[in-house]
């Protein structure tokens, strides 16, 4: 499985609604964080290695309600701390 992060900008006041829909409707979603800055949410997903990331984002993430913009980050390596 390959982790990706999707930064999501939502319509004003609708970030929590969007997060709830994502958790309920998209099984690949692992975690969602509300964040500060130019985006409202950071969604962590685990995708099968052979899944088309662009198609997943376009068909599943962009279909969520109240989304205005996204930025997808594809991971290379994971580093873990001690504890």
Predicted regions and their residues:
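A compositional/biophysical signature of low hydrophobicity enriched in polar/charged and small residues
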Residues: 1-83
């Amino acid at each position: 499985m390959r982790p990706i992060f999707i930064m999501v900008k939502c319509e004003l006041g609708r970030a929590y609604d969007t997060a709830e829909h994502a958790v309920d409707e998209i099984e690949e979603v692992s975690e969602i964080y509300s964040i500060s800055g130019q985006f409202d949410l950071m969604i962590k997903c685990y995708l099968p290695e052979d899944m088309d990331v662009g198609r997943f984002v376009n068909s599943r993430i962009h279909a969520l309600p109240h989304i205005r913009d996204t930025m997808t980050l594809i991971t290379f390596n994971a580093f873990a701390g001690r504890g």
